[in-house]
From Swiss-Prot:
Keywords: Calcium, Disulfide bond, Glycoprotein, HDL, Hydrolase, Metal-binding, Secreted, Signal. The active site is at 115 (proton acceptor). Plasma, associated with HDL (at protein level). Expressed in liver, but not in heart, brain, placenta, lung, skeletal muscle, kidney or pancreas. The gene is PON1. GO terms for cellular component: blood microparticle; endoplasmic reticulum membrane; extracellular exosome; extracellular region; extracellular space; high-density lipoprotein particle; spherical high-density lipoprotein particle. Its EC number is 3.1.1.2, 3.1.1.81, 3.1.8.1. Glycosylated. The signal sequence is not cleaved. Binds 2 calcium ions per subunit. This is Serum paraoxonase/arylesterase 1. It comes from the Eukaryota. Its main location: secreted.
Length: 355
């Protein structure tokens, strides 16, 4: 009888493990391969070799790019060098990147590890760049002021808070005000790995201001990219491992109310919003297994989606670009400017295409 009970328990355990393993593979979209979708004229951006994880394009065509991210469990081609912020002028016929110098006596450039970024321009046309930073595996938000003539960033402030432990991306709604996604609940790397494997969906979104910090949305399976509609009324949140983009209504007191969700057959990463049309442009990972378990012989693919009329009952989703990783590995972000598309990656290169 004891052997029968032990065998039964073992069988139940194996069945649960197999079911959970299958769920884990589904969340990572582990079996998907992409069919190429090409654009007419694409060129790799010179000077970007170690990632372009997030980018934002100003209305005047200046693009800010975060490069050199070191993230636990993700490949890095230059793990011992600090990250940087790059500038690209998309008004140029053949734009190149320039590394922005960082000034400010209290900022440690040697530990700079930039992740998500967002800009805010005030009434005096002063432009602020907010950057998620992971110095020594921690999470901070660095506040910079862009000095256009000097082509540099003046460091103004480092923001830390207990509700910002695992920041991934932010969207600025003021010089020191933002919504931010925490992609994990736990701080400990071991517990984070189990959190992800078990699909606990405990990650969350925070509203931060100097006077108030609070959780405004929760229950995400790896909250990732975040952005806001051009009119400031709606917030978009990418849930990476659930393959969803959520639409929230933003209220005057900065709280969020869920409106709808869209499902995709891909892992949605960063969200860019076209300021003229309101369209969403999303950098995606068709197969998350290839991102988290990197193999140079079978690299992660890239994919870009465009979402039109997201607030209507029938949004239009278009696969604008897809490639199996031979050109561009691990796309995370895409943004448009005057008929051109700039695509960034978590640890690889960047691609500039005509639409």
């Amino acid at each position: 009888m004891a052997k029968l009970i032990a065998l039964t328990l073992l069988g139940m355990g194996l069945a649960l493990f197999r079911n959970h393993q299958s769920s884990y593979q589904t969340r990572l979209n582990a079996l998907r391969e992409v069919q190429p979708v090409e654009l007419p004229n694409c060129n790799l951006v010179k000077g970007i070799e170690t990632g372009s994880e997030d980018l934002e394009i100003l209305p005047n065509g200046l693009a800010f790019i975060s490069s050199g991210l070191k993230y636990p469990g993700i490949k890095s081609f230059n793990p011992n060098s600090p990250g940087k912020i790059l500038l690209m002028d998309l008004n140029e016929e053949d734009p190149t990147v320039l590394e922005l110098g960082i000034t400010g006596s209290k900022f440690d450039v040697s530990s700079f590890n930039p992740h998500g970024i967002s800009t805010f321009t005030d009434e005096d046309n002063a432009m602020y760049l907010l950057v998620v930073n992971h110095p020594d595996a921690k999470s901070t938000v660095e506040l910079f002021k862009f000095q256009e003539e000097e082509k540099s960033l003046l460091h103004l402030k480092t923001i830390r808070h207990k509700l910002l432990p695992n920041l991934n991306d932010i969207v600025a709604v003021g010089p020191e005000h933002f919504y931010g996604t925490n992609d994990h609940y736990f701080l400990d790397p071991y517990l984070q790995s189990w959190e992800m494997y078990l699909g606990l969906a405990w990650s969350y979104v925070v509203y931060y201001s100097p006077s108030e910090v609070r959780v405004v949305a929760e229950g995400f399976d790896f909250a990732n990219g975040i952005n806001i509609s051009p009119d400031g009324k709606y917030v978009y949140i990418a849930e990476l491992l659930a393959h969803k983009i959520h639409v929230y209504e933003k209220h005057a007191n900065w709280t969020l109310t869920p409106l709808k969700s869209l499902d995709f057959n891909t892992l949605v990463d960063n969200i860019s919003v076209d300021p003229e049309t309101g369209d969403l442009w999303v950098g995606c990972h068709p197969n998350g297994m290839k991102i988290f378990f990197y193999d140079s012989e079978n690299p992660p693919a890239s994919e870009v989606l465009r979402i039109q009329n997201i607030l209507t009952e029938e949004p239009k989703v278009t696969q604008v670009y897809a490639e199996n990783g031979t050109v561009l590995q691990g796309s995370t972000v895409a943004s448009v400017y005057k008929g051109k598309l700039l695509i960034g990656t978590v640890f690889h290169k960047a691609l500039y295409c005509e639409l």
